[in-house]
Amino acid sequence: MNILSIQSHVSYGHVGNSAAVFPLQRIGHEVWPVHTVNFSNHTGYGQWGGELIPAAQVRNVIDGMEQRGAFERIDAILSGYQGGSDIADVIVDAVARIKEANPQAVYACDPVMGNAKSGCFVSDLIPPLLRDKVVPVADIITPNQFELEYLTGVPAHDTTSTLEAIAAAQEMGPNTVLVTSVRRPETPADAIEMIAANEQGAWLVRTPFIDFKRNGSGDVTAALFTGHYIRERDAADALARTASSVFDLIETTFTADSRELLIIESQEAIAHPRLQFEVEQIA
């Protein structure tokens, strides 16, 4: 299947398209990346070279793909960190044009804004644009618990309230919601959870918590869930496969004490998930 991935790019390390493209290829997809920034490395280092790519240039790349007849062959559009606020208009326009060419195409949006520990780390213009313009045209969204609360205005602190927030997100437009980095009162201190939901139900998976955050893990998670989901539209199966691969990736990176995700070293766990974590239906 063909996936158009509109995200940031770094030359050194793995975030954005530099984290999403190879895992998607390893699970069998053709990936057409369009970059929204071109940096030497991710901004977590505090210093970097490069620049945001102007929205007009991003649009020109997408227009060129349309001229090649690519739109009707795109099965999914994936977007992540958007760089400048005007990129939202480009993405929304591209989604509409691609769906006109191929009504079966799905749009997966990773609404990158921040997290519970760091708060919001994007421009103040980005969150309302995601909430009001981008998320409503998405079929799949992959927020963390913090981002879900912002998008919906519904506190998500336990199972019931998180499901209510997911329902509120679905009312905004997306049919399928993956919530990452979930913490509930009953979640053990040494565990972390994800919840996936669509019109067929909601499922939870719990994995060991490794207190080791590396930039790009959310990008890999969004990419793998999207890549697995679009094959069979099976949220539980996509959740199980994604959780397995991402845990093995984080564990491998942690064991090596690597500053960057060890995606190449983890490629077998990505291509062939061990499915070591049970998925529980909760709704």
From Swiss-Prot:
The keyword Lipoprotein does not apply. It comes from the Bacteria. Its cofactor is Mg(2+). One of its GO terms (biological process) is pyridoxal 5'-phosphate salvage. Its EC number is 2.7.1.35. Pathway: Cofactor metabolism; pyridoxal 5'-phosphate salvage; pyridoxal 5'-phosphate from pyridoxal: step 1/1. CDD domains: pyridoxal_pyridoxamine_kinase (cd01173). Gene3D superfamilies: 3.40.1190.20. It catalyses: pyridoxal + ATP = pyridoxal 5'-phosphate + ADP + H(+). Keywords: ATP-binding, Kinase, Magnesium, Nucleotide-binding, Transferase. Transmembrane segments: none annotated. InterPro entries: PM/HMP-P_kinase-1 (IPR013749), PyrdxlKinase (IPR004625), Pyridoxal_kinase_PdxY (IPR023685), Ribokinase-like (IPR029056). The keyword S-adenosyl-L-methionine does not apply. Homodimer. NCBIfam families: PRK05756.1 (NF004398), pyridox_kin (TIGR00687). Pyridoxal kinase involved in the salvage pathway of pyridoxal 5'-phosphate (PLP). Catalyzes the phosphorylation of pyridoxal to PLP. Belongs to the pyridoxine kinase family. PdxY subfamily. This is Pyridoxal kinase PdxY. It comes from Corynebacterium diphtheriae (strain ATCC 700971 / NCTC 13129 / Biotype gravis). The lineage of its organism: Bacteria, Bacillati, Actinomycetota, Actinomycetes, Mycobacteriales. The gene is pdxY.
